[in-house]
C-alpha cells in the first residue's frame, strides 16, 4: 500500500460521513468539557477555601463518578451506532481487496483523528468555561467573587484527556474484535439483520411489571425520611429496570395486541405503522427507554436541587429560631482517661459570656434565655413508645422511630408559654414534625407509664434540630423536674452510656439578623475565651477540659446555602448532560430509522401507496411510540 493511503482514506471517510462523525466529535468534546470543569472544581484550592467549600469537594467527587459512568455509556452507544451503520461499507472494502487488518488500520486513523479533535476541543472549551462556572459557584455560595483569570489545572487537563483517550482506545479495540469476527457476507447483509417478527418475552414483561410496581410502591409508601434515604436508590434502580424491561417486552405485547384487533389493524392507516413498529421495536426499545429515563432524570435533578436551594432559608429559620446557642460543660479525667467529674457551666457565667461577646462585636441582644430540655428516641409500636437498642437491619429499625423533646412546664412558662397547670400524670403535646397536622390521642404511653394529654400546643419554644430525623417528632411539656428525671432514668436503664443527657444552653436573639458568618465566628471565639478564663482562672490542670458548643444562625445559613448551592450546581450540570444525552440519542435514532424507513417507504410507494398515505403512516408510528 502507498504510504499515507490509510490516513488519506480515513480523512475521506470522516468527511463523507460527517453527519455521523461531527456529532460524535462534538459529543465527546462536550462530555470532556463538563468532566474537566467538575474535576477541576473538586481540586481548586481557591474554591475549597471558601466557606462551605467542603461541600463542593464532596458533591463534585460524586459528579466525577457520575460523569465517568455517563461518558462510558454515551460514547460506547455512539460507537456501536457508527459501527452498525458502517458494516456494509467495511464489507465493500473487504470485497474490493482490503484485508481486515487494513480496515483496522483505517479505523485506527479515524479514531486517532476524531479523538484528537474531541480532546483538544473539549479541553479548550473546558478551560474557557471553567471561569464562568467558578463565578457561578461563588454566587451560589454567597461568597466574594474574586476577579481575574482562574488557574489552569495541568493535572486535571492531563487526567481528563487521558480518561477519554482510554475510552477511545477501548472502543477501537472493540471495533477491531467485531470486524475480526465478522465475515464479508455478514458485513454486507448487516443492514437487513433483525427483520424477523419478534416474540413477546413473557419473563421480561412480568419482571418489568413487578420491578416498576415495586419501585413505585416503595416511593409511595415509605414515610420515614431516614428509611427513605436507604430505599431511595433501590426504588430508582427498580423503576429503571422496570422501564427497560417494559419497553423491550411490553411494547411488543401492546403492538401484538393491536395486531390481533382486526378492526384496528386492518386499516390502511394503522397496518403499515403497527407492522413497521413491530419489526423495529426490538432494536429501538432500549433507545426509547433511555430517552424516557434521561428525560425524567433531567426533570428530577433540576427540580429537586432548585427546590432545596429555594428552601434553604426556610430550613435555617425552622432549625434556628434564635440567633445563637451556647452550651458548656466542665470535665475532669483520671490519668487512665476515665471521666471522674462532669458538670454544666453555671448559667450566669454563660449569660455573661454571651453578653460580653455581643458587646465586643457590636451586637445588641434582643432576647436571651436559659433552656433546659431532654431529647429521647423511642420505637413506636402498638400505640406505645419504648426505649429499645436497635440491631440488625437499620432501615427496619427506623420504621417506628419517634423522637420526643421534653421540658418542664416551668421552663415552658419562662420561654413565653402560657400556664398549663399540669398534674404529674398529665402532659401537653406539640407535633413538631412538619408532616404532622395534629395530635388527636387522649393518652400517650411511654414505657409502662400512661400520661393523659391535657392539651396540645401550637408552638414549641425549643428546636433541637431533630425535626427531619424521624417520622414522629413531638415536643412534650411535663409537670416538673421529678417527671423529667423519671423519663431520664427510664431511658438510661436501656441505653446505658449511649443514653441522652440533659441539654442546658443559652439561646440569644440579636436586633436585626444582618450579620454574617465572619461575625458569628468572632462571636464564638470571644465567648470561648471568656469561658476558658472563667473555668480556669489560674491555670488549666492536667485532666481538666472544657467542652464548648456554640452555633450561630449565620454560620448555619452559610453552611446550608453552601450545601444546597453545591447540589444545585451539580444538578444543573448533570441535568444538562442528561438533556444533551437525550438529544443525542434522539438524533442518532432519527438518522438510523430514517435510513431504514427510506427503503420500506419506497417499497410502499411501489406497491401503490401515495406519498400522502406514506406520510400518514409515519405520523401514526410517531403517535404510537409517544
Model-found features: residue ranges?
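N-terminal Sec/SRP start-transfer signal
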Residues: 1-32, 197-202, 247-295, 596, ...
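Peri-transmembrane interface segments
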Residues: 19-26, 34-66, 81-84, 92-93, ...
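Long, hydrophobic alpha-helical segments
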Residues: 62-77, 580-583
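Juxtamembrane interface at the cytosolic side of transmembrane helices
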Residues: 77, 85, 178, 224, ...
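Hydrophobic alpha-helical segments
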Residues: 113-258
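Basic-flanked hydrophobic alpha-helices used for secretion and membrane insertion
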Residues: 315-580
Amino acid at each position: 500500500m502507498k504510504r499515507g493511503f490509510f490516513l488519506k482514506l480515513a480523512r475521506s471517510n470522516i468527511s463523507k460521513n460527517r453527519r455521523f462523525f461531527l456529532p460524535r466529535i462534538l459529543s465527546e468534546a462536550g462530555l470532556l468539557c463538563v468532566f474537566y470543569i467538575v474535576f477541576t472544581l473538586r481540586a481548586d484550592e481557591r474554591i475549597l477555601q471558601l466557606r462551605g467549600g467542603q461541600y463542593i469537594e464532596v458533591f463534585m467527587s460524586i459528579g466525577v463518578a457520575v460523569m465517568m459512568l455517563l461518558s462510558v455509556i454515551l460514547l460506547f452507544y455512539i460507537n456501536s451506532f457508527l459501527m452498525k451503520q458502517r458494516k456494509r461499507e467495511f464489507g465493500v472494502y473487504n470485497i474490493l481487496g482490503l484485508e481486515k487488518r487494513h480496515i483496522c488500520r483505517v479505523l485506527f486513523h479515524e479514531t486517532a483523528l476524531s479523538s484528537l479533535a474531541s480532546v483538544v476541543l473539549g479541553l479548550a472549551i473546558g478551560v474557557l468555561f471553567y471561569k464562568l462556572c467558578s463565578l457561578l459557584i461563588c454566587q451560589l455560595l454567597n461568597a466574594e467573587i474574586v476577579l481575574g483569570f482562574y488557574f489552569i489545572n495541568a493535572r486535571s487537563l492531563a487526567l481528563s484527556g487521558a480518561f477519554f483517550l482510554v475510552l477511545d482506545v477501548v472502543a477501537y479495540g472493540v471495533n477491531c474484535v467485531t470486524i475480526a469476527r465478522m465475515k464479508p457476507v455478514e458485513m454486507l447483509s448487516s443492514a437487513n439483520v433483525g427483520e424477523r417478527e419478534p416474540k413477546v418475552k413473557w419473563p421480561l414483561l412480568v419482571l418489568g411489571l413487578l420491578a416498576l410496581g415495586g419501585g413505585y410502591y416503595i416511593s409511595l409508601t415509605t414515610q420515614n425520611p431516614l428509611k427513605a434515604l436507604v430505599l431511595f436508590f433501590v426504588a430508582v434502580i427498580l423503576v429503571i429496570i422496570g422501564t427497560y424491561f417494559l419497553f423491550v417486552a411490553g411494547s411488543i405485547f401492546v403492538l401484538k395486541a393491536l395486531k390481533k384487533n382486526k378492526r384496528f389493524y386492518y386499516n390502511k392507516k394503522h397496518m403499515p405503522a403497527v407492522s413497521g413498529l413491530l419489526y423495529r421495536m426490538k432494536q429501538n426499545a432500549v433507545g426509547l427507554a433511555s430517552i424516557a429515563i434521561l428525560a425524567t432524570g433531567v426533570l428530577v435533578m433540576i427540580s429537586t436541587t432548585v427546590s432545596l436551594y429555594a428552601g434553604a432559608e426556610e430550613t435555617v429559620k425552622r432549625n434556628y429560631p434564635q440567633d445563637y446557642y451556647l452550651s458548656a460543660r466542665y470535665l475532669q479525667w483520671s490519668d487512665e482517661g476515665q471521666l471522674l467529674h462532669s458538670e454544666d457551666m453555671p448559667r450566669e457565667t454563660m449569660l455573661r459570656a454571651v453578653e460580653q461577646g455581643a458587646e465586643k462585636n457590636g451586637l445588641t441582644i434582643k432576647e436571651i434565655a436559659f433552656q433546659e430540655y431532654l431529647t429521647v428516641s423511642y420505637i413506636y409500636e402498638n400505640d406505645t413508645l419504648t426505649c429499645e437498642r436497635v440491631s440488625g437491619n437499620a432501615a427496619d429499625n427506623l420504621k417506628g422511630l419517634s423522637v420526643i423533646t421534653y421540658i418542664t412546664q416551668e421552663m415552658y412558662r419562662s420561654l413565653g408559654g402560657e400556664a398549663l397547670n399540669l398534674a404529674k400524670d398529665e402532659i401537653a403535646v406539640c407535633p413538631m414534625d412538619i408532616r404532622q397536622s395534629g395530635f388527636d390521642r387522649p393518652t400517650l404511653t411511654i414505657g409502662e407509664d400512661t400520661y393523659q394529654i391535657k392539651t396540645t400546643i401550637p408552638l414549641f419554644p425549643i428546636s433541637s434540630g431533630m425535626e427531619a430525623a424521624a417520622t414522629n417528632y413531638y415536643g412534650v411539656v411535663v409537670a416538673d423536674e421529678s417527671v423529667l428525671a423519671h423519663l431520664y432514668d427510664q431511658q438510661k436503664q436501656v441505653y446505658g452510656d449511649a443514653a441522652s443527657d440533659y441539654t442546658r444552653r443559652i439561646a440569644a436573639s440579636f436586633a436585626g439578623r444582618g450579620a454574617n458568618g465572619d461575625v458569628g465566628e468572632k462571636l464564638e471565639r470571644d465567648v470561648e475565651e471568656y469561658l476558658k478564663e472563667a473555668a480556669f482562672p489560674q491555670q488549666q490542670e492536667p485532666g481538666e477540659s472544657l467542652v464548648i458548643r456554640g452555633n450561630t444562625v449565620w454560620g448555619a445559613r452559610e453552611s446550608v446555602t453552601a450545601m444546597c448551592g453545591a447540589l444545585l450546581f451539580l444538578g444543573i450540570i448533570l441535568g444538562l448532560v442528561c438533556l444533551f444525552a437525550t438529544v443525542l440519542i434522539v438524533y442518532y435514532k432519527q438518522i438510523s430509522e430514517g435510513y431504514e424507513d427510506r427503503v420500506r417507504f419506497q417499497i410502499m410507494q411501489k406497491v401503490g401507496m401515495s406519498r400522502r398515505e406514506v406520510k400518514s403512516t409515519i405520523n401514526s408510528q410517531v403517535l404510537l411510540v409517544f
